[in-house]
Amino acid sequence: MQLYNTLSAKERANLIDQAGEVRLTLSFYKYAQIENPKLFRDYLFIHWDKINVLGRIYVATEGINAQLSVPATRFEEFKAILDNISFLENVRLNIAVEQDNKSFLKLKIKARDKIVADGLEDSEFDVTQCGVHVDAQSFNDLISKPETLLVDM
């Protein structure tokens, strides 16, 4: 089974033009404990390559960080693949406002040490322990307090 791209960027661009279909550009990330990033990488490649997903995805023991495009007609199928992965079920997908069918020309999924170059040592904390979601009013109330420090990443 092929787990890598065989077409050049130019060949892929021509195929995108010939297909004439609208693609959705989107991104998502999720901190989760992935025991075998290389195996997970291969799983994603096998499933996403079948539905013509293109993009740049990083997988590590700490989670996944993805920027990609998917044919609009295959979006529900793509979403179903995500929802079959327990920690990605109902993950928030950030769909780009401006679309470019050629935002990505290849599917590149890389197993890495980290999904974000943040300089932190993951062994010092549990990346799956996240904060509490607050609505807009609560957020505004929190940041209006002088003792609140807001870090925008």
Which positions does each model-derived feature cover?
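Cytosolic catalytic domains that perform sulfur/thiol-centered chemistry
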Residues: 1-153
